[in-house]
Amino acid sequence: MNPNKASRPVFDASAVLALMHGEPGADRLKAVQPDAVVSAVNAAEVLAKLVSRGMPAAEAQAAYEALHFETTPFEPAMAAISARYVRKGVSLGDRCFLAAAERNGSGWTSDRDLGTLFGGRVPALNYFR
């Protein structure tokens, strides 16, 4: 595992959920998962999605923790980065993911539209499907 958080790939909520459910592309995510981190905001998105689908909150938390992701805090500097994306109509969760990916240098998502919106500002967005 790479101890330098600033160079570790960031998974968005769609990536975490794909791993949990064995969705298409999960095999690509498994290859980088040991080094990946998840922003606390995106972890909250994952838990909210699981609970909204009927899973008890404690079970959702246990399912997330079973993946052994390091969950990183959403820091004030990242809030400033995420604010740059608000005019593009991007959701809060996606803005927080993009800020974390920009800080760390790469991110994994299923949302191909994110890469086209920002003119390459995020150094390396990877798409798992």
Segments and roles (model prediction):
Residues E70-R112:
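Active-site neighborhoods of divalent-metal-dependent phosphate/nucleic-acid chemistry enzymes
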Residues M1-N4, L98-R129:
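Acidic, PIN/NYN-like endoribonuclease modules and their adjacent C-terminal/linker elements
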Residues S14, E23, A40, E75-P76, ...:
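Alpha-helix N-cap/helix-start capping motif
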